[in-house]
Amino acid sequence: MAVTITLKTLQQQTFKIRMEPDETVKVLKEKIEAEKGRDAFPVAGQKLIYAGKILSDDVPIRDYRIDEKNFVVVMVTKTKAGQGTSAPPEASPTAAPESSTSFPPAPTSGMSHPPPAAREDKSPSEESAPTTSPESVSGSVPSSGSSGREEDAASTLVTGSEYETMLTEIMSMGYERERVVAALRASYNNPHRAVEYLLTGIPGSPEPEHGSVQESQVSEQPATEAAGENPLEFLRDQPQFQNMRQVIQQNPALLPALLQQLGQENPQLLQQISRHQEQFIQMLNEPPGELADISDVEGEVGAIGEEAPQMNYIQVTPQEKEAIERLKALGFPESLVIQAYFACEKNENLAANFLLSQNFDDE
C-alpha cells in the first residue's frame, strides 16, 4: 500500500511524494529530483532528515516508520561545483549602488583561490564539514553577482519573529530546543549552517553530535589547509574588522544589519565575503586580541578592506542627531544607540525595534 511522504525545505516549501513501503530512500531522492529539478535538488546533494536522523539511501521507507502527519526535511548541499563556472548566477543586471567613497578592488589573492570545478572530486561529506570546507549548504552563500547582494547576505540570517519561527521549524526535525539555540548561536542565526552544525557537531560543543562516520572523519582534518588558502586573511590586521568582530561576538544579532551596510559601502568586499562565507564566519569566531570599545565600530563598517584609517568619526545631520536623542530617551546607552542607528541604516523605527528586542547589559 502506497504512502504519502510530506517533504519540507528550509525555505518552508512543502510538497508530497507517493512511495511504496519497500522502496528505498534513494528512490525517494530520485523522485524528488524528477519533480523539483536536477539543478535544484540533485540526488547526490540531497540529505533527508526525519526525527533528527539522516535517512540512509539503501534503507526501505517502511523501516523509518514515517508518520504521514509529519514531514521529512530536505537539505541540499552543493555537489555540482562546476555549475558555478559554467554559467553566471541569475541576477539583476543593475549593479549594486556604489558609495561616494572610492573603494579599491578586492585583493587578487582572493581570485587565486582554486575554482569550484577543481573540487568536483570531493565527496559530499567533505562539502558538508562545517569548519574545513569552503562549500556550504545551498542557499546559505549569497549570490556574488546579484545587484542586491547585501540583501542576499543578510537574508539567510534570521532575527526577531523569524528567529522563533525557524527555531520551531528546526526543533520539529527532532532536536531539543537547547541544542537548536546553541547551533543558531554558533552559526550567527544562519538556519542552514545551524542544521549542518546539528548534524555534524556544534563548534565548541563539549560532545560532538552524531553525524555520519565520514563527516566526523572530515571534521578531524587539520584546518591549516583552509587557513592557508583564506583569501580574507588581509582582514585580520584591519582595526575596523577587529572592532566589528568584537561587537558581533557581543551581539550576534547585529551581523545581518552590518553585512547589509557593508554591502552598500563596500560591495566589492561583500562580494568576496559571499564567496568565502565559511572563512569569514571562522574569523568572526576567533577570540579578539584586544577588547575594543563597542562604540569603535561606529562608521567603520564601510572602511573594512580599505587603507583609510581616518574614518574614526562620523558626521550627523541635525535631524539624525534628534533621532539619536529620541532613541537615547528610551533608556539605552549612547554608544549602543549610535551603533544600532547606523547598523539599521539610519532607520529610527527599525533601530528602536532592534534595541527593544535586545537584552543589552549596561557597562
UniProtKB/Swiss-Prot annotation:
**SUPFAM superfamilies documented for this protein:** UBA-like, Ubiquitin-like, XPC-binding domain
Q: Which residues form the Ubiquitin-like domain?
A: 1-81
Q: Which Gene3D superfamilies match?
A: DNA helicase RuvA subunit, C-terminal domain, Phosphatidylinositol 3-kinase Catalytic Subunit, Chain A, domain 1, XPC-binding domain
Placement of covalent cross-link Glycyl lysine isopeptide (Lys-Gly) (interchain with G-Cter in ubiquitin): K122
Instruction: State what changing T77E does.
Output: Impairs UBL-UBA domain interaction and enhances ubiquitin-binding
Q: Where is this region: HIV-1 vpr binding?
A: 319-363
Region: Disordered; residue ranges are: 81-160, 203-227
- One Pfam family for this entry, by name? XPC-binding
Q: Where is the composition biased (Low complexity)?
A: 85-103, 126-147
The impact of changing K47E is:
Impairs UBL-UBA domain interaction and enhances ubiquitin-binding
Kindly list the places in or outside the cell where this protein is found, as annotated in its UniProt entry.
Nucleus
Where's the UBA domain? 161-201, 318-358
Q: Which Gene Ontology CC terms are recorded?
A: cytoplasm; cytosol; Golgi apparatus; intracellular membrane-bounded organelle; nucleoplasm; nucleus; proteasome complex; protein-containing complex
| UniProt effect for mutating P333E | Abolishes interaction with HIV-1 vpr
Provide the GO biological process annotations.
nucleotide-excision repair; positive regulation of cell cycle; positive regulation of proteasomal ubiquitin-dependent protein catabolic process; positive regulation of viral genome replication; proteasome-mediated ubiquitin-dependent protein catabolic process; protein destabilization; regulation of proteasomal ubiquitin-dependent protein catabolic process
List the PROSITE patterns: UBA (PS50030), UBIQUITIN_2 (PS50053)
Q: Which NCBIfam families match?
A: rad23 (TIGR00601)
The annotated subunit structure for this chain is: Interacts with XPC; the interaction is suggesting the existence of a functional equivalent variant XPC complex. Interacts with PSMD4 and PSMC5. Interacts with ATXN3. Interacts with UBQLN2.
Report the domain remarks. The ubiquitin-like domain mediates interaction with ATXN3. The ubiquitin-like (UBL) and the UBA (ubiquitin-associated) domains interact intramolecularly in a highly dynamic manner, as each UBA domain competes for an overlapping UBL domain surface. Binding of ubiquitin or proteasome subunit PSMD4 disrupt the UBL-UBA domain interactions and drive RAD23A in to an open conformation.
Q: Which family does it belong to?
A: Belongs to the RAD23 family.
Q: What is the designated name of this protein? A: UV excision repair protein RAD23 homolog A
The scientific name of the source species is Homo sapiens (Human)
Lineage of the species this protein comes from: Eukaryota, Metazoa, Chordata, Craniata, Vertebrata
